[in-house]
Each structure stands twice: as structure tokens, then as C-alpha cells.
Amino acid sequence: MKITDVKIRTLTGIDQQPSGMIYDNKKVIRVAPTDIHPEYRKKKGHISVTHVPQEDGTFKITHHFLIIETDANIEGVVGPISNPMPPLYIYTYLKPILLGQDPWDSDRLWDIMYRSCVNGRKGENMQAISYVDCALWDIRCKAAGLPLYKMLGGKVQTRIRAYANTAGYPQDLESVRSAGKDLAEKGFTAIKWGIAYGPAQGDAGMKKTVEIFRTLRDAVGPDVSIMLDAWSSWDVRYTLKIAEQLKEVDVCLIEEPVLADLQDSYAYLNAHCCIPISGGEHEYTRWGYKSLLDKDACALYQPDPAWSGGISECRRIIDLISAYDRLASIHNSLPGVGTHMSCIYPTSVVPIEEYLMLVGEASQYFLKTPVRPENGFFTPLEVPGIGMDIDESKVDSSVIMPEQY
């Protein structure tokens, strides 16, 4: 089997009536690393895979999918690609490497792609390699007629505990209370709340954050785990100060309190903060993770198969985490892939899996087989492949992205 073409397919659809709340980029309030610059304080990050409201009351969704074709009429499909630069990198650097190659030679191809990006070993260049690697796994799984988890060695967990990521939810206390009760009633035993305040908002913002978590704890009761996502926007002093106030409501984890490159700060917080620290969502490859692990930087590490190097590298990362006797939880840009990868490890390595309640729904809009937790647990798909095939009935228009765009 040989690779015959590599292309990016742009899909557009109209969601007439979303089933629930949407992630609205114009309304979402969240903390951001750029908040320390006053002129950027209100310019939050745009999430490209989400619904865009239209004047007629409908919602437009535009996603980019990577398609790798073979001479065996088997396609590798993965998406949506969540950032603008990976398609350019795929077309410019990776497609010439891939054409004519055997998709079964995944480790060889990964090594060639990695060695070809010495000036882009992290960030969106590595995301491009990650999407390619996922598509190659899709080809091999389909050729074998097996779902991804079986190609990776089979289930260790038959189902995986899910936590609800509430990114995009309103921040007023009544909405927080209502959301907490709703998620607990849906069977979630763990909730992560993204926050809107950091050092730039001072003590007043800190007070509001503490009030939010008191409200959330009151809504869900004592038995639901509560986590906090600081989105790389705090500093060491702020984290230590607010953690002392949050421990009264039993917050069990603070995710990404500081910028990803501040590994020594992560290690200091992991050793001295009264609440455990998680991170790694914005780290890349086994070498990046080894540096974190050598510093004992986190209690829980969060690699993303769509970002950190693909399925191949993410597996190596989690194996490395397990060798250090630490915990992993996949950052779930691709929920189907995340569930396949989570279930092949015991709970002593991967105890829980993320589901982005709003972004996850939008990102799976075009999929034939979206993956969602039921009653608080994920179950991996049984269809051959990684589960990214497109439901053409949802596609209103489709074009192949030009190689020079």
C-alpha cells in the first residue's frame, strides 16, 4: 500500500438548532496570558472549531479535515484541525515526505517528519505531524478492520471516568450553580471550571473566583471532584495565595497555573502548593515531557494526541509518565482518539478523561460517530479506524484547500 495524495478538505455546515448551549467566541469571558497587557485584556483567544451565529438565527460551522489517500482506496481521515498553520506545514513540508510511502511504516515516517522540522519541534509544526500520524493510524486500522484501541493492544479499562470541562460556560453565580447541578445529574463525578480572573484583575478577581468555586461546591455536594483551569495565566505567588482559599471547598487540581515554559515554576508549585498541579497540554514530544518529569513538575500530565506528536508519540509519552509513576489524562481535542488511548491503560496510569462540553460538541459536528460520555463514563468506539469519518449529510459545502493559500 502506498500514499497517493495528501489534502485538506474544508467543510461548511449550518446547524439550524444546536441541542444545547454553544461556545460563542464573542461572549465567552476567560482569563488569558495576555491579560497583563491592559490593551489586550478583552481580546480573548478565538476557538475556530465552534459555532458562529448567523443573522437568521442559525449557526455556521467550518472545519478543516486532513485526508490521506492510498492506492488501496483506503483514506485516513482526521479533524477538525484546530489551528490555521498546520495545513500550510502539511502541504509545504510533510506532503513531499509522505507521497509514495507505505502508511504501515509509521515510526519511520514519524522520525523523518520530526528530523525535518528542527526549526519547529514544538507548536503548530508538531501539531501538523500529529494530525498526519493520526491519519496514518486511521489507514492502518481500517486496513486491518479494527478499532484503534485493538491496534494499540486492547482494552485495560472497559470504560473511562469522564470529567466535564466547562470552557465557555457563563461565569455568573446563578449560571454556575445551575450548571453544576445539571452536570452532576448527568452522571459526571468530576467537573473542571475555566476561570475568568487572574493577577491582572487583582484581589477583586480572586474574590470572584473563590465565590464561583464555593457556589459550584454547594451545587454539586461533597462527592464530585472539582478542578480549576487557569489557562497558563497566573503566576507562582497568585497561585499559592488563591490555593489557600480554594482548599476549603476541596478543589482537587489546578491546571496550567503558569506559562508552559516555566517548568521550574511548575515544579515549585507542585512541591509547595496545597492543591496538586497539572499541566503538559502545551508541551510536545517525549523529550519535552521528560524534562517536566525529571523536575517532578506536575501531579497529573495532559498530553494531546492532536498536538504533542500524534497517537504514536502520545503513547510513548504516557508510557514514560507511567515509568515515573505519575498520572496522565489526555487533553481531548479529538475525543474519539482520546477514548481509544485512555482505555489501553490501567486507572493507575490514566484515571480520568476530559470532555469539553461545548467545544467537544462543536468539534464533532461533522463526524459519523461522535464520542460522548454517558452517565459520566466514556466507552471506545468499535468501528474500524480512529472514528473521524465524515457524515456527508451534515456538509453543506466542501472544497479542497489549495496548496498555496
What are these regions (language model features)?
Residues 124-127, 133-169:
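Glycine-rich, aromatic-flanked loop segments that form ligand/cofactor-binding clefts
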Residues 3, 73, 94, 132, ...:
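Conserved, mostly hydrophobic/aromatic
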